[in-house]
């Protein structure tokens, strides 16, 4: 049956728990409703990526991990470290909520969307990815979906790894997790990654001067976590991480002015939590602080020159989550408080501003016979636009053993970001962007194939756009998104297959024109097998036709970008029980394509890596 585990035993740890692990026969997830539950009881489409998956794929960036997942469309202005956007099910990049250990990613505060090209892949131990509306649980941004990156390791030991590759890529990483007595464990990590890169922009997008240089990326990361069990029921943790990145990119050149083409990002985050894990009642309190400084400057003049820009953001968060088991399900409730502050002189916001938000929410999940019911409601009180409410509901019916029909409806919203509100062209009277979504799905297990097929519609109103005439942001846009998503995974002998298909018709509801940079169709296929102790993997991705703007001349022209098929080949060999060597060829057939018009992709790339564990 689909219901492989009782909800009474499933809800054993509170949401955002760093101890969550994959278990057999059903993976446990914590992101869907802020409490741990079997993935089969989550009615929204959910995907889990483990560190073992990331190592098997030999991914060198978070974007390379996410591009493999259903409903995800990644665009990037070139290679490693270059500006990137995540589109989920055709929604805007700002309509994706990115969490780090359950806490909102700070870097999205000023610009409004998460650029995961800057987040170190070394920190990622697990990814939980939920499609569809989730504002009734998490508040702003969760229109297209939620990506929760979990950083804490789930196994003890020490690992030393090194890798090299095309474009002078090199990576060195050391991590360890040690038990201090029976009740305490500590985790430490250090990582260094660097690539010389390549020239990402074709002449024409950079103004009157070509910039035939390598656009490289450098990242240095430190991480530490301390976890302690006070009793069988009470536990706590403290963790922190920081990274220092430098990115070289191609910028638009204006004669006589400095060429701002270097980005320097400093980011640090600290959080602490206390958990109570009783038999029927669970509770967790988390406090978090994060601080980022994002400089863009001309390296000839330095990042403190008047030509440089700085985006500086501080974020303070307090979360109190609770869960109680009732009947064949549970009820959850909690409070979120968040303050985002910009420093005076921030590029988007000249003066210093604070934005505060307090949200209260209630969630529920109950099984009644062959039916599963899920609901959530939330009210947010924002210091800028006042109170806003969202809700969602879902129902699942297992009409035949192993087969289920799911129907859901939800509302969600996106709050204006600080740049849109208070920047040089800001409008403090902006309202939130609003969404209404419907979805119907069938899923089941047929002849060893786990499959799901769903259709959805998303109507987004009050979209925030920029007016070239008034030089202000305003609420006027509307979007209409219709889509079909199909996923399946199965084994044939020694071969493991994972496949997905996405059809997305994302349009401006006023002009009936396609939304930019979204592929209308995508096919993704992962094939894994073992032969003579070698672990092999083939990744295939088809990106369909999409549209973009050519910004090299005015007026801007809409351009059509053709589809492309991409193949990756990866292999790993365990030399000993401690030493593993890995190799990968990305873009095996050296396809020439772009995800953002005018910005070149890397072509064929090679990587070779080794890891030693003890």
Swiss-Prot record:
A motif (TonB C-terminal box) lies at residues 597-614. GO terms for cellular component: cell outer membrane; pore complex. GO terms for biological process: monoatomic ion transport. It comes from the Bacteria. Residues 1-20 form the signal peptide. HAMAP family: BtuB. A motif (TonB box) lies at residues 26-33. Ca(2+) 2 binds at residues 213, 215, 249-250, 261. The chain crosses the membrane at residues 158-165, 169-178, 184-195, 217-227, 232-248, 263-277, 279-296, 309-325, 328-337, 353-369, 371-381, 385-400, 403-417, 434-443, 449-458, 473-490, 494-509, 517-529, 535-550, 558-572, 585-596, 602-614. GO terms for molecular function: ABC-type vitamin B12 transporter activity; metal ion binding; porin activity. Ca(2+) 1 binds at residues 199, 211, 213, 215, 250. It is a multi-pass membrane protein. InterPro entries: B12_transptr_BtuB, Plug_dom, Plug_dom_sf, TonB-dep_rcpt-like, TonB-dep_rcpt_b-brl, TonB_box_CS, TonB_rcpt_b-brl_sf. It holds the Pfam family Plug. Cyanocob(III)alamin binds at residues 83, 85, 92, 110-111, 251, 309, 517, 551. Keywords: Calcium, Cell outer membrane, Ion transport, Membrane, Metal-binding, Porin, Signal, TonB box, Transmembrane, Transmembrane beta strand, Transport. It is found in: Cell outer membrane. This is Vitamin B12 transporter BtuB. Residues 38-152 form the TBDR plug domain. Involved in the active translocation of vitamin B12 (cyanocobalamin) across the outer membrane to the periplasmic space. It derives its energy for transport by interacting with the trans-periplasmic membrane protein TonB.
